[in-house]
């Protein structure tokens, strides 16, 4: 097992700030109120020649009645036994809190690998606050300022003493899959069903997943990187701050993905927001699988719902539809199989001679309308790139290619190039271009 360093503590003590400081970039969302990081986030880190996985957990609040915090507590408790080092973070500016004492009780069985991190020690006056934390009973205490980096180097020097000399096993390449959808349609449940691990907190509270979490995964000798994102809400429902930042990350996840799983609620059918999200995927030329989740409570049969989806999301006509019940694991294997199929089409490359034959076959069947009374010709065609498959046509009249004809042309290209389940980007240029 790879070296694992787990950051835990009650909400708003600076765990995510420390996480970001260690990995050197803004990964977890940081805001000044409790509960901002609600999911477990992992990233690769290195210090003094040793590599490790750093884990940022949600806030641990024992005995809380709040449903969400209970879920986070469970995740953290699952992580503690697997950790090589536990960074127990407390707030040195605020001082010792009763919740710190409650959390400490959970950690006493693992005291030999606990480093007590007193954060927010920004000046000499605050350094006096460190002494009271010795009452928690942990031997090694490190005053730091995660925000300014003070003391973090000394902390990491101690961390690496606990680590084994090994390389972190990571999936450097893989099919990047983003789960996109409105809040509470079951994206995190799908990720959990795939991973068979409660890595992402699942709660019926809409908007639970705030961070975009990249999770390497292997299935049937194929590498995947699953990206679980915050539910995307319409702008009118998003206030500035934490949700705004998460929506931006969700859109970024679409840009990073090879295949987007557009998750819709089968009990509601496709909504206006689903259409908007589908439009984002289409305009970015991403591979797509439409996932109709919660089929166990859908008022429609699979055949009926497929007809509705095809009508409402007609612009994603290349995307296969998978019906799932994520909480029961139903449809997960089929989903993974379709992701693989879509990716194969998304990365398909054809020789120029093959592309030219396909293009001229389409033109012979139905040429574009004449332009100002003149014949529209294609001098040659070629595939410029993949992800998406991009076909370039060199023509005498680029302006003659209207949208209706381009849609027809792309549909026929998909047939003749055997790219059935991925978008094709068509680029039309004149000779002078």
UniProtKB/Swiss-Prot annotation:
Pfam families: KH_dom-like, MMR_HSR1. It comes from the Bacteria. GTP 2 binds at residues 181-188, 228-232, 293-296. InterPro entries: G_ENGA (IPR031166), GTP-bd (IPR006073), GTPase_Der (IPR016484), KH_dom-like (IPR032859), KH_dom-like_a/b (IPR015946), P-loop_NTPase (IPR027417), Small_GTP-bd (IPR005225). PROSITE patterns: G_ENGA. CDD domains: EngA1, EngA2. GTP 1 binds at residues 9-16, 56-60, 119-122. Residues 3-167, 175-347 form the EngA-type G domain. Keywords: GTP-binding, Nucleotide-binding, Repeat, Ribosome biogenesis. One of its GO terms (molecular function) is GTP binding. Residues 348-432 form the KH-like domain. One of its GO terms (biological process) is ribosome biogenesis. Belongs to the TRAFAC class TrmE-Era-EngA-EngB-Septin-like GTPase superfamily. EngA (Der) GTPase family. Associates with the 50S ribosomal subunit. This is GTPase Der. The lineage of its organism: Bacteria, Pseudomonadati, Aquificota, Aquificia, Aquificales.
